[in-house]
Regions:
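Acidic/proline-rich low-complexity IDRs
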Residues: 6, 21-22, 68, 106, ...
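Compositionally biased, intrinsically disordered low-complexity segments
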Residues: 18-21, 40, 66, 86, ...
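Winged helix-turn-helix DNA-binding recognition segment
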Residues: 44-103, 107-108
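Acidic-enriched, low-complexity/disordered segments with a strong bias for Aspartate over Glutamate
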Residues: 10, 61, 87-88, 117-121
Length: 130
């Protein structure tokens, strides 16, 4: 039996694959451009080992956009069911500060559970929004 040959993907930086079902869903299509970019950035930082640590300041720098737009993009993804807040941020000048951590609902959970796909339960009209 012949061995399957690998596809010629450039794997030097890793590969981020997003489900076609998600990309063609009305929930995804109703998102703003900043929220769509944030969704991809969150998946880029995803690991099966734990929740994604990604804050507003980091989103401001990587999208790039204003603080208000970054906060709005997080809220939009949360309301649409694409992300769920796991731990809120904490700032303390004497001890270590930590960023917000998120669970991406279309990807497996670090607790060895499958994706919950909460975004499928939310019905959004493209013309009217959430």
């Amino acid at each position: 039996m012949a061995k399957k040959s690998n596809l010629p993907f450039d794997k030097r930086g890793g590969v981020v694959a997003i489900q076609r079902r998600l990309l063609s869903s009305p929930e995804y299509l109703a998102l703003t451009a900043q929220a769509k970019v944030l969704l991809t950035l969150l998946q880029r930082h995803w690991s099966p080992a734990g929740p994604v640590g990604f804050g507003v300041r980091q989103a401001e720098e990587e999208i790039p956009c204003s603080r208000t737009l970054a906060m709005r993009a997080f809220k939009e993804l949360e309301e649409a069911g694409f992300i769920v807040l796991v731990d809120d941020s904490l700032f303390c000048s004497r001890t270590q500060s930590k960023t917000r951590t998120w669970r991406l609902t279309w990807l497996p959970c670090w607790r060895n559970r499958g994706p919950t796909n909460d975004w499928e339960d939310r019905r959004v009209s493209i013309s009217t929004g959430p």
